[in-house]
Amino acid sequence: SVGNVVDPEEMVKKYGADTVRLFMLFAALPEKELDWSDEGIEGAYRFLNKIYDLVGKIPKTSKGSRDAYVYNRLHKTIREVTDLMEKMHYNIAVSKIMEFATYLQKNKEFSGKKCFTDSVKNTCLMLAPMTPHIAEEMWNKLGEKGFASVAAWPVWDKKMINEKFDVAEDLIEQTLKDANAVKYLVRTKAKQINIYISPEWKYFAKEIALKNKKDPKRIMFYMMKDERVKRQDGAARYAVHLTKNIMQLKSLMPQKEEYNILKENEKFLSYDLEIFVKVMHANEGIGDRANRGEPGKPGIEIVS
């Protein structure tokens, strides 16, 4: 377009043909002209370097604590990218591959050798039509025979996809987001982060609220009739809170399941937050902060 003229040959010399091709596929929209961006091409260049580096970071351990999570995301990505490529929505396909590569990078310390290798290999094959040169280099470095360009396109396996991992990921991501927000607000050097699963009575209360979603006025009535809820400090306030926010309430994950997900991912949370994390039930904590959590939104305590 006028005022945004770029010499493709110069860009190829500087960044390589694969980077330019990837950027053009990512930035081009069917309904408008390509809008060249130096920041965009730099981003594509960094992404390809990052994805290439993954080949040299294959774990040595046979199994990882998050293999099932990674396989779930891998096969969902293959399914989505396959559909997008068939519909020629290349820009969204590139975006999905980038998202998965970032996810894989984040999970490399918690993936086993086979899981990580399968993930890198399939990412390489999905990239092959768009970035053939780097795909062939990755293919060769992985020790695969022949050429990536003529290898079979990845096939997603529905047995490897399980919605429970998506639900678990949502909980983990929300917890990380909340913990980072608290870290930012506290602004003191922390030694540890305690994550408190909500007291059990709040799960009973939320269950009552969800059952009365069509008639919120009855939430207080039924909560004050329930022996597990009414004797708790703050039960009336929580009933008011649930009534006010009834339309935002989502389905309820059992307390045991919520605890198990976060406890099993304690090391992953510590790695992401760059600080030791301990997941506990509310009754294991001391003070008010341990009881502030809600179902699906644990309490966060910074220990300095």
What is the predicted role of each segment?
Residues 23-27, 35-40, 60-69, 90-98, ...:
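Short coil/turn segments at secondary-structure boundaries
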Residues 64-80, 98-99, 103-177:
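Acidic, turn-prone loop/beta-hairpin segments
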